[in-house]
């Protein structure tokens, strides 16, 4: 969702759809999302993103989350569900803090079926 929020070429309908979510007072970020977004942001966009993120609480990634993410990844793998490491971390941080994950990425629904992840999968506006 954050990539779409900051990407200049995102269709206006999608930006309108996610704006209420990213401007909520109870929103939080996790460190893997910050890493994922800033690692691929164009140099001219980074300061805008960092200023926006500076206003949002960031959920830390305790060392135990890495082990829990590994276990979740193994559970997914055993169920035939292949999930990238960063998405496993994002899901596990959300479970650790009891935070709901709001996303367009449908593979988080598969993770939710195999874990305690509370995921809201938004249909992408057209």
Regions found by a protein language model. Name each.
Residues 28, 59, 120:
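General small-molecule cofactor/ligand-binding pocket signal
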Residues 101, 116-119:
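Hydrophobic beta-strand scaffold residues
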Residues 1-29, 38-51, 125-126:
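Short, well-structured N-terminal submotif of metal-dependent ribonuclease cores
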Residues 2, 34-37, 108-109:
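A generic structural signal for short hydrophobic patches within well-formed alpha-helices
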Residues 5, 16, 57-106:
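Active-site neighborhoods of divalent-metal-dependent phosphate/nucleic-acid chemistry enzymes
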Residues 79, 110-113:
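A beta-strand edge to alpha-helix "cap/lid" segment located at domain peripheries
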Residues 30-33, 104:
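A secondary-structure boundary/capping signal
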């Amino acid at each position: 969702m954050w990539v779409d929020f900051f990407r200049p070429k995102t269709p206006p309908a999608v930006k309108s759809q996610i704006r209420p979510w990213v401007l909520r007072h109870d929103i939080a970020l996790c460190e893997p999302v910050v890493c994922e977004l800033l690692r691929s942001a164009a140099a001219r966009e980074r300061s805008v993103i960092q200023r926006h993120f500076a206003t949002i609480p960031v959920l830390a990634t305790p060392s135990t989350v890495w082990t829990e993410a590994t276990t979740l990844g193994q559970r997914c793998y055993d169920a035939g569900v292949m999930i990238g490491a960063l998405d496993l971390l994002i899901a596990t941080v959300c479970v650790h803090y009891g935070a709901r994950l709001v996303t367009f990425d449908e593979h988080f629904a598969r993770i939710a079926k195999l874990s305690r992840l509370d995921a809201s999968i938004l249909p992408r506006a057209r």
